[in-house]
Amino acid sequence: MTIIIAGKNTLTLTSLAAAVLALGACGGNSDPFESKNTKPAYLGAVAIASYDGASDDLLTAGLGKTGLGGTAPAVADPLKPTPAELRRLAIFNNYRAILDISTNGGYGTLYGPNVDAKGVITTGEGKIAGTEYIAYSDDGTGRQNITMMVQVPASFNPANACIVTGTSSGSRGVYGAIGSAGEWGLKNGCAVAYTDKGTGTGIHDLQNNTVNVQNGVRTDAAAAGKNSIFTAELSASERAAFNAATPNRFAVKHAHSQQNPEKDWGKWTLQSVEFAYFVLNEKYGDLARDGATHLKKLTPSNTIVIASSVSNGAGAALAAAEQDTQGLISGVAVAEPEVQLAPDARLSVKRGASVLVGTGKPLYDYFTLANLLQPCAALVSPATNAFNTVNAATATNRCSALKANGLVTGTTTAEQAASALAALVAAGWQPESNVLQASHYSFATLSVGLTYANTYGRFSVKDNLCGFSFAATGAAASATPNAPVPASASALATSFGASNGVPPTIGINIVNNLSAGGPLLDAASLSAGGVQDYNIAGALCMRELATGSSANAVRVRQGMSEVVRSANLRGKPALIVQGRADTLLPVAFTGRPYYGMNKIVEGTASRLSYIEVTNAQHFDAFLAFPGYPERMVPLHRYFIQAMDMMYANLKTGAALPASQVVRTVPRGLTGAVANPIAASNVPPIKTTPAAADQITFANNVVTIAD
């Protein structure tokens, strides 16, 4: 077996076999039908590294609780970071990207490396020793190269075996779930099965033809070959022509792989579990009679497997459970899942006087609607919007453009803004999201929508879909303000450790190629007549791909149809937790209809509970932004509890909670500073909720406690 050595204190799978050969030879095995452990055919070479839990570790890369809460770790040579330095940066940035790393917000008290599996606050740094295995899953072409990783903590006990899946959230790389499913699994002595699900830090610098390889290092695309995380499908002549027409641009894997990986997120998640079983049985299985292979000691019959993660990773976990024909998954516990359902008018969801019929909207549909309306809606209450960075003058022009296109009503800007916000609420956003719309437009909406337009339609980077491209842009005070420029060499070199997989990231921005006068940073670009309106033409083009009849729209909707889920969890116990104020993946389009359709599809076999948390939203990391901490509580606290409850159910048969609304208490302010979080702000999920907090299903109607 080919082995790539990665990191320090390394060993190989074949050496593991040799190490236990003598023991295996002593006992023998008279069973003529040995169940041998075999490497899945889709797995490439396996890189293995062991970490001592002091100088380096699985959870914090040696940084510990203090280091994760501090400044980014230094790189000796920013132009030539080592694989170990890139790994450390990736763990640092991915951990912090999904959690609030502030003491007042709960880091170090409610959660964090120093808080043990029982929730006890310790004085330690929370470093976890163990072994890490990394490999590609691929079909042999090198075009898929789905990164798989298994972390096995030193505390893993094969007599008490458990595996937790940690498919990455967003478009993140393989360490994307380190702070969610990863931390919970490692603390509880479980192996953690991660995958980047075909997204991740695959950044192809088309001008210089460099890419990331599996360990994050950047190199020439030709030299990387099949070890590249992602290389755009362009011939040399196509790349030269593209560079001549649009220099200094980038292709990014999730957007430009032309494979619509979301359709296979369940498959990749199941493969990560199979990889985990392979690794564990190589490590703990007895030797077969041939003296070379190992037997399958750990199987679904003696191992608890929880499909988990958050956001896109949560959606992948649900998809995996739906597709699990081998019984690999024991139960599901996820937070804020990105999940899409086929239209079904049998279902209704009722909250107070509001009733929505059907299964919500597909992701690309509601993102393109938000991309049109959010900047105008931000003007309803600009002084009270959380972390509002929307430019008022540009947003005013967007309101005017929406009115001209018949998308809002009103004669004044205030009336048009109110109309835009009302349209968002009517579509399904909860009123609790109103003050969060501005921040989501600034930091998420266009970037996510554009990525999904490209991936669903399987567009190439050379298509410049809707006139958009990805490039670094000049600073406002530079000689080329907001125009495409060469990217920072150090930012590219360290991209594996810092990128989230969705531009804007590591200084690579979204560019409007069609801006009047030449390509510019999209937010600063000029529409007809030199007007700045957040590129209304680009927003309308993206919307047409969701609702129109063009050839490109047909391509996008075909891709959208490939990612719908069935809501059939095959009778597995499952918990979904989601924040009521989720503005990225609104509950009306995700958790609520999924719960209802699961009840319709599975009937009395359903074992899914849906937990909706008030004063919680999608990005716990946003709790560090102005306007967020006094209003919102960390959803992560409830993810941890859901995992604890699912594990207890699978281990001891403990009852799972009924579906419910958990009513939290905002922290509020003392002066201008958010109060420290206390246990009273985040009451626990109850096994049996009060009648006024119940979420119920009857006669195809989900009723949400108001």
Curated annotation (Swiss-Prot):
GO terms of biological process kind: butyrate metabolic process
EC number: 3.1.1.22
Gene Ontology MF terms in the entry: hydroxybutyrate-dimer hydrolase activity
Keywords of the record: Hydrolase, Secreted, Signal
Domain of life, source organism: Bacteria
Signal peptide: 1-27
Catalytic activity: (3R)-hydroxybutanoate dimer + H2O = 2 (R)-3-hydroxybutanoate + H(+)
EC supergroup of this enzyme: hydrolase
Active site: 311 (charge relay system)
Pathway(s) served: Lipid metabolism; butanoate metabolism
Main location: secreted
Location within or outside the cell: Secreted
GO cellular component: extracellular space
Role summary: Participates in the degradation of poly-3-hydroxybutyrate (PHB). It works downstream of poly(3-hydroxybutyrate) depolymerase, hydrolyzing D(-)-3-hydroxybutyrate oligomers of various length (3HB-oligomers) into 3HB-monomers.
HAMAP family cross-referenced by the UniProt entry: 3HBOH
Protein family membership: Belongs to the D-(-)-3-hydroxybutyrate oligomer hydrolase family.
Protein name: D-(-)-3-hydroxybutyrate oligomer hydrolase
